[in-house]
Amino acid sequence: VLVIAPAATSSYDDLAVAILMVDQKKITEVHVLLVNPHTGATLDEKKVKLQWDNKFIAFTKLQVTPKEVEKWKEDFVRLMVKWDGGQHMEIDIPLTSRRGLVFAQTDQPIYTPNNDVNIRLFPVTRQLNPILSSLVVDIMNPDGVVVDRIEKNAFEVEKVMELRPFHVPAITSLGDWKIVSWMKDKPQFNYTSGFKVEEYVLPTFDVSITSEQPYLHVYDKAFTIHIKAMHIYGKPVMGRAYVRYGVKHQSKRTLLSTSSALARFEQGEAMHTLRQKHILEQYPDPKLLLGQSLYVEASVISSDAGEIENSILDDIPIVASPYSIKSKWTVPFFKPGVPYIYKVLVLNPDGSPASGVPIKVSFSFDSSGNWITQKRKTMDNGIAMQTINTARNSKKLNIKVQTEDERLEQSQQAEASFTIASYSSPSGSFIHLNAHREVKSPGEHIVFDVFIKSAAKDHVLHFNYLMISNGKIHNFLQEGRKGDTTSVSLLLTPELVPQFRLVAFFILPSGELVADSIIIDVKDSCHAKLSLDVAGGKRLFSPRDNVNFDLSGESDSWVAVGVVDKAAYVLDKKNKLTANKVYKAMEASDLGCSVGSGKTGPLVFRDAGLAIMAKEISGMDDVKDPGCPNGHTRRKRELVLEIAIEKASTYPAELRKCCRDAAIESPLRLSCEERTKHIHDEGEGCQETFLECCKHVEEELLIAMEEEDEDLGRSQGEDFMIQESQVVIRSHFPESFMWEIIKLSRSAENGKSRITKKMPDSITTWDIQAVEVSQSKGLCVGPSLELTVFKQFFLKVHTPYALKQYEQVELRVVIYNYMNQDVKGEIQVKCGDGICTDAEQNEPLKSRFAVEKNSATSFSFMVVPLSSSDSSVSVLARVFGSDVHDAVEKDLRVMPEGNYEEMSRSWSVQPRRHGGQQVIVVDNETPQNVVPGTEMSAFLSAQGNLVAETIQNTLKGSKISNLLRLPRGCGEQNMMYTSITVMVARYLNRSDQWNKMGDPQLKKRSFDFITSGFASQLTYRKPDYSYAAWLHRASSTWLTAFVAKVFSQARQLVFIPVSEICGSVRWLMRKQDKDGSFLESKPVVHLNMMGQVTGKVVLTSFVFIALLEARESCINEVEGFTVVVEKAHGYLTSQAMNGLEDFPLAITAYALSLWKVSDGAAKVTMHTLKTSGLQTEELIHWGSNKGKAAAVESTAYGLLAAIQHEEGEIAEKATNWLSQSATFGGYFQSTQDTVMALQALTGFESCQSRMKKMDLSFKIRAEENGVFDKEFQITNDNAFVQKPFKVPVHGQLTVTASGTGQGILTFVKKYREKVVIKKDCKGFSLEITTNLDNQVKQRRRQSINPEFNVYRFIGCFRYLRNQEPGMVVMDISLPTGFEAKKKDLDDMKNLVDNYIVQYEIRPGRVFLYLDKVNKDEKNCVGFRLNQVFESNLVLPVTATVFEYYEPDFRCSKSYHPKMEVNPDASCHGNICNCLQRHCVELKGMADEDRNADRNGNACRAEYVFIIGVTKVTKTASYININAALKTVLKKGMDQAINVGARRSFVIPMHCGKNLNVSPGDIYLVMGMHNAHWRNSDRTQYVLTSDTWFEKFPLESVCRLPSPPASCQVSENFKGCSLKG
């Protein structure tokens, strides 16, 4: 009996067994069993009968269940056969618990930070049938660190699993992220896909660079490239390319300085050639370039729109010999006397196939020395085939291959030698398979020829055939022999996709097994039917067309659909789920050792991935153990299991599992050494075996992968245009849509469904993909369907990120005409309210255009926002004489002038301390320099929990960055944001108060935010688990401790690998000094807070606290942990008695109290702390001599220490002080004080009784414009969720609180502050200059964009404080229409003379970080400002320098690009008219003709004054008129006004050009109350177009003997006849 089975199997697959009776003389019953090798118990069994009816062959399947396998520890199952009473055979089949595959799909291939990634998973068997399995998914950043873990439980109805979205953090690692998924019950087998994270905008067109050869020979005279630029919608780009070449060595790039050139496009294509002279000028000896690479950059500028897209062709090898020769596709054995087809693969240096290369093939047999030479050329796939007629008695075939490229010298040609052995047969018999080359599809027949050579061939009446695919035998059949050559036709079934091995064999009467095998490719196709198409087959649509998608698939299947803008795939397409990826994964299940044949008949089976056993057949000793021999690399990509099985066989049985498990990849990506430390109870020798096998697998897999990487109109006049009412405006431009799963039920007609979708407005090509999962037919990834949304005539509107009020900015429209005729027409621009254009009043802006066919033109227009409200622009272009048109609407974001500011104050509310009723008076004055016309708001917020405001704003989306107004660009800043959320989430968890927050999803979102923060922080982690403010700087002990502390706290809430925490702990332990203190090599914290002498105490306390927080996670993971902690405690104890300053004292007191409250040093330190604080009856705080931020942090540590020591009175007083120090929203001055204050306050709240009585009543009263009254109550139920009340922005507020409990009252006023020429500076001086950069301007005009200027910004500051500075930040606002040149910022950061350590670009702003500041001289930064939009009337903007940890120390200055424009020509035409329409009009000298109008206005106006001008000043944007009131005829809302009072009247700068107001002038001013704002006695009035502004004569003039008529007018004017 001959038994054939796969060389390995899975506990989740059936085991197919083929059985043949060698001696076909009698009917025999064969009993086939699967046996537990440990107990001998039968797992499954079948009985088959071999007889004449079935040609004495049988094919059966057995199954072993995963639950049974889990009961024993062996890595194999025993296959046993019994027949004829007592005869039996058995063989051990290696067993894997691999269950199947998991494929992942994302809704886009690339994302920007702060976006959501939608993920689908498709868990299937190796045969692609759906699996019901719970899954675990790790999201891994580019550094290989798991930043989020998502678990998804299986449900019967879900064949496609959609995960919750993964939120990419706002600050994170850019690059390639991984999605690592595995089935929950099989964590040892994981599957990887991915997505990319970059800061990008979708390209408007695709630029690709190709070279005529994929390498540069070191002596090449020329190197030619081809550049292709195509719009995403398929049309060629017209324009030019700026081409640059350079040399890359490792990561360093060197530009070939004389190689830059312009290349012009024709029909979207351009060509350029690099000449050898350009290289020799910089590298006279080309041989020095060997081993380096060439790169090519191309910036393509479209001539129509001026848009720029870039591309790079990278890593072009510079070589002396450009080719390599491989023979991996060659069958390793030949049959003597049968033509042998030798395949050679020639590769380029980049691994791509080298086509058209002449080669010389020489061969000889045995040791004859007689070489026969033939010449060939490689095909497109790099393969050249040579047929060699072999000699009948040859044992060895020698082959030499050499390239014959005529461009190369002989020494530069590639060559290789190979030896092919003959098939070995004792009788000289063999069988040879030859398949017809055409690749067939499932359902078709494959035809192949079988050739036999044997002296005993008359005894061979039939051949036996096995078809093996994906590690399984799919068919076993027998066909009769028809002479020396037999043609056989076999039906291809879907199970054989993508390829199968065909084994043919016969058995001679002598017992010799003769066999051959080949690999046959099957055309990739799905078993399941899936079709997604558009009804009618249409591929071209217009925006907003309804598209009917016809979906056809299997009944009861699930189809996942997604649509992506093809522009996204221009940026990254490697992670797209394709059918090819699925089939490649299936190929990995192949168990074969070679591409076919074998040394002997039995070895043919082994090399085909089969295990065989037979008693009657000779040569079986070679195959008694299944699997490939040493030295043979399998074609599959997943080789780990086989390597481990082979290695495990060299160990005793009790250690084989230790070795085998080493092959299973750790989900946490731990090293072999780290994994070994987790082995504890597996017996003696297991750790050593595991480590040795783990390293062996890594080395062998690396070798194997290296080998595998060798693979490869007509015109009807201008009187007709489409009516505007018929126009559809395009305004919806998503990157992806239609992320849906569609169920095809049995009730659907033949598995069909029609889906109707409206296409978005984008002019682009959409890539539409459908993936089907059928219960019966498995997974099918359908081909992409591309639909182009296009108009032959369309617009593209270019707008800046934001406009600023009163600034004049150019907007540009590009008109594309892809029709086959030139067109003329009209373009019409309408802007929303509050936008001035060059149009007539209440009319759209119109202009005519002419565009040639297949061309484009641009149209520009100026806009000026008059208000700070967002608006929109709508552009319509219509062609004369036709209905051809397009319209686009875009939002215009308008930012008010000035900077956002807020002022706030908090009060502790404790009525019981005030006799049961507490009265709080809130000053509500308007700050100086408020921008006129901007909204101002004031709020009062009262809550019954000291940290409620912080919790609300942290967890409910009120952005911390806005409240704190600090940048976040380094590792410490990022941790601050994460740690705040950790603090409040821990508090709500401990106090079980999530249900009181009023949002059931809040807990989940909070945990997601923490996970996202963890991911962001890993951006700053080094390989040794230490952290630095920036990766290129030295690691910081303090920051690493901060991270370890927060991660330890966060681990109680979300998944964070212990290895991350303990890795940092190990690094910290190495920073401990002999005396127990800790050393800091790169300070991050504010040095002033640490003190000159006590800095070591502060740092040691901080690290000590972090280690205690991490104790639970690391005490058993980190060797020596306890010793280090005890040494640190000893050091702090010795220093506690040394008269520490407030901050070191407070942090030391808290650190010692964490160790043990009863400790003597802890008690003494706490006593000292109590007596040193600044106390009142209700408050206590520490550290005020070091600034507000230091005082907050010191008091926070003092409060934490008091809580530990149960010092209730001290804790309550410290809590009161901290509560009153918070800003609106619950935040403080900077990062660390906010973090520690919040930890302390939540700690205080946590230790209060959960059942404490809360019943506070509040009454708010304001007397302004009548009476404002508001009453509300706070109880335990709403202590967290009380919202702020909006209160009047003017006038004193009185708040009366009564009842029981303790709360906090916060007042905040928000407003826009004018940019002033000079502001008060504290701790810094600052100088700003901006000048036109003529040299840069000239270069830009030669290359990229000639229209706009370039300016150079220089900012210099001096540090004026008498102490060492900490980190300094420069916050630089950019003028509208300008952007910072990124290369200059990179140079400031990266060059050896670096000025900054990091920068951060935000819309309209740049943050620069300096950690090296010279106290004794100026510190300067500088970069170029590129003008990207034309702007006139540009307003000044502000640059500010401040200390990061003490932001009160700052200096701000305004600056302005020195524009080359005439100030008198800053506006023109109707823009000026539009601006003036909103301006106050000076009526001139009083005149009797205006009497009626004057009196009518006096009756309508709410205030009527006659003023005398005392002073006129100008700011950046306004004229301020200070005046004394000479007559008050109507007071309006300003009831406190009287004659002689002083008031200010404000006019926008662009309105004051022709007013000529001077001190001493007298004016009549009448207007409405909504145009003024007040600040105590400094009420200011904004003069607008609704204001009556008339000049009155001077009193001295009216006393003249003959006064002018205007004097009579002024004397007679008494206002409205109705008294005001």
From Swiss-Prot:
Entry PTM: C3 precursor is first processed by the removal of 4 Arg residues, forming two chains, beta and alpha, linked by a disulfide bond. During activation of the complement systems, the alpha chain is cleaved into C3a and C3b by the C3 convertase: C3b stays linked to the beta chain, while C3a is released in the plasma. The alpha chain is cleaved by the serine protease complement C2b component of the C3 convertase to generate C3a and C3b following activation by the classical, lectin and GZMK complement systems. Phosphorylated by FAM20C in the extracellular medium.
GO terms for molecular function, please? endopeptidase inhibitor activity
Sugar attachment sites: 190, 989
Predominant location category? secreted
Extract one GO BP annotation from the record. innate immune response
Please report the stretch or stretches of sequence annotated as the NTR domain.
Answer: 1479-1616
| Key word Secreted present | yes
SUPFAM superfamilies, alphabetized: Alpha-macroglobulin receptor domain, Anaphylotoxins (complement system), Terpenoid cyclases/Protein prenyltransferases, TIMP-like
- Which residues does the UniProt record annotate as the domain Anaphylatoxin-like? 658-694
Q: Which UniProt keywords apply?
A: Complement pathway, Disulfide bond, Glycoprotein, Immunity, Inflammatory response, Innate immunity, Secreted, Thioester bond
Q: List the disulfide bonds.
A: 526-780, 593-628, 658-686, 659-693, 672-694, 836-1474, 1062-1114, 1321-1451, 1356-1420, 1467-1472, 1479-1551, 1499-1616, 1598-1607
Q: Which Pfam families does the entry mention?
A: A2M, A2M_BRD, A2M_recep, ANATO, MG2, MG3, MG4, NTR
Q: Where in the cell is it found?
A: Secreted
**GO CC entries:** extracellular space
**Could you tell me at which residue positions the Isoglutamyl cysteine thioester (Cys-Gln) crosslink is annotated in this chain?**
970-973
Region: Properdin-binding, residue numbers: 1406-1416
On assembly, the entry states: In absence of complement activation, the C3 precursor is first processed by the removal of 4 Arg residues, forming two chains, beta and alpha, linked by a disulfide bond.
* Function as written in the Swiss-Prot or TrEMBL entry: Precursor of non-enzymatic components of the classical, alternative, lectin and GZMK complement pathways, which consist in a cascade of proteins that leads to phagocytosis and breakdown of pathogens and signaling that strengthens the adaptive immune system.
Q: What is this protein called?
A: Complement C3
Name of encoding gene = C3
